């Protein structure tokens, strides 16, 4: 088996560039609790969004091959900041860890602040090339996810759906949720038509996701 498992039609040169970039320098840049704290928009950005407990921190750690890059909050919904990570030295692009959504126990004012921060970020960030919206394979797309997809559609931000925890369900169930998620993607004008299934624990889909990130930032 080759070191990098490629999807059909994938560009092997881009896949190798992705492997090297994500194996190289990656560093935390800053946390931005409000728009005025965002870094200078000097390089392309890829944002990661998802419900609380969707496995976003684990996926970011697997993607960057680092155990402690993204830390999991003890209390879902507590962190209301955009966390920036530089990829490359000097930075070639940035990963943006968006605060989780769909937190049942969060106060209403926290939810409102989240919507304002994310909505303003999505609408005004020209260097944002794509948002990766993470969906738990075990649960599929929920109404709160659809709300975020509509927010992205309205802001005309290109996004792609990524299934997480794909190793936690049977192959037949994964095939069903993958098909249902792609069917949902086709309903949304700003969504990429293809869905990537991943497992942070098993490494499934990680090479494909790295390549998709490079494709989105046009490297």
UniProtKB/Swiss-Prot annotation:
Binding residues annotated for Mg(2+), in chain numbering: 57, 79
One Pfam assignment: MMR_HSR1
SUPFAM superfamilies: P-loop containing nucleoside triphosphate hydrolases
Keywords (A to Z) from UniProt: Cell cycle, Cell division, GTP-binding, Magnesium, Metal-binding, Nucleotide-binding, Septation
Protein's UniProt name: Probable GTP-binding protein EngB
Sites where the protein binds GTP: 50-57, 77-81, 97-100, 164-167, 198-200
One example of a Gene Ontology biological process annotation: division septum assembly
NCBIfam families: GTPase_YsxC
UniProt keyword NAD, yes or no: no
GO molecular function terms attached to this record: GTP binding; metal ion binding
Cofactor requirement: Mg(2+)
Entry's family note: Belongs to the TRAFAC class TrmE-Era-EngA-EngB-Septin-like GTPase superfamily. EngB GTPase family.
Functional description taken from the UniProt entry: Necessary for normal cell division and for the maintenance of normal septation.
Residue ranges of every copy of the EngB-type G domain listed in the record: 42-219
